Amino acid sequence: MTERPPSEAARSDPQLEGRDAAEASMAPPHLVLLNGVAKETSRAAAAEPPVIELGARGGPGGGPAGGGGAARDLKGRDAATAEARHRVPTTELCRPPGPAPAPAPASVTAELPGDGRMVQLSPPALAAPAAPGRALLYSLSQPLASLGSGFFGEPDAFPMFTTNNRVKRRPSPYEMEITDGPHTKVVRRIFTNSRERWRQQNVNGAFAELRKLIPTHPPDKKLSKNEILRLAMKYINFLAKLLNDQEEEGTQRAKTGKDPVVGAGGGGGGGGGGAPPDDLLQDVLSPNSSCGSSLDGAASPDSYTEEPAPKHTARSLHPAMLPAADGAGPR
């Protein structure tokens, strides 16, 4: 093995740049064993790979102008890495959901490769924070400052941060139902149902009583409410007309004062005059009348008032059953 002079050995080795060159210039001389003879060389021995790898990256106080050793660089880098790891999750948790801003310029990303994720989350209009403390304060104050602005769209999307009195100003029907409560609604429904049932029972009872006063050809003929009302109207009109006819006949007999024979004949004539009301009654009570074919309709309980019908007044006042005039009798 031949010995090379230090100058030639330094020229043949690759040149160190940056921080490696500074460390090589500041390191003390080393001893090299050549052919059993120990000689000093000005060339620095190769440092450990982990130290060189950590020192090669740019960080706070890691450049040639920093003047710090490998131990200081390692501690500073570890502190910066731990702080960056602690800062990135805090930024992601504190920042509310919203449209992702545009990425930062390439120059800022190249200068801070370890904080690239942090730079992309920051707004594009502001530069990247220089100190970690400022970045943490910015990430905490950003959601509070942008809540009132239009960055998140409508303010109604965050009702817990905004005061919205629209519900108090314009209450909806659903809120009224919630205010009433289920117990009040059930009690009101029960009261309404009982009142309607009681009213319907009264109406049905009144129709049943009216049906008993209307004579029909089949006595047990089934009639609807509409038919009961129509037959009752016809029956009342028939009775009113019959009473008017009887009153007119009595007035005529009192004026004429005829003999009993003529009076008897007049009585027969009165009976003949009473035939049309009988025919009208038969027409009203016949099952083929127009009332039997009428459609059933809903009758209002207030459309009529229950009045006692006359008890067979037509039969008691029929002309054939009237007493004879005074002085009349068989001769």
UniProtKB/Swiss-Prot annotation:
SMART domains: HLH. One of its GO terms (biological process) is erythrocyte differentiation. Keywords: Chromosomal rearrangement, Developmental protein, Differentiation, DNA-binding, Nucleus, Phosphoprotein, Proto-oncogene, Transcription, Transcription regulation, Ubl conjugation. Leukemic stem cell. Residues 56-70, 263-275 have a biased composition (Gly residues). GO terms for molecular function: chromatin binding; DNA-binding transcription factor activity; DNA-binding transcription factor activity, RNA polymerase II-specific; E-box binding; enzyme binding; histone deacetylase binding; protein dimerization activity; RNA polymerase II cis-regulatory region sequence-specific DNA binding. InterPro entries: bHLH_dom (IPR011598), HLH_DNA-bd_sf (IPR036638), TAL-like (IPR040238). Residues 187-239 form the bHLH domain. It is found in: Nucleus. The helix-loop-helix domain is necessary and sufficient for the interaction with DRG1. It is linked to A chromosomal aberration involving TAL1 may be a cause of some T-cell acute lymphoblastic leukemias (T-ALL). Translocation t(1;14)(p32;q11) with T-cell receptor alpha chain (TCRA) genes. Implicated in the genesis of hemopoietic malignancies. It may play an important role in hemopoietic differentiation. Serves as a positive regulator of erythroid differentiation. This is T-cell acute lymphocytic leukemia protein 1. It comes from Homo sapiens (Human).
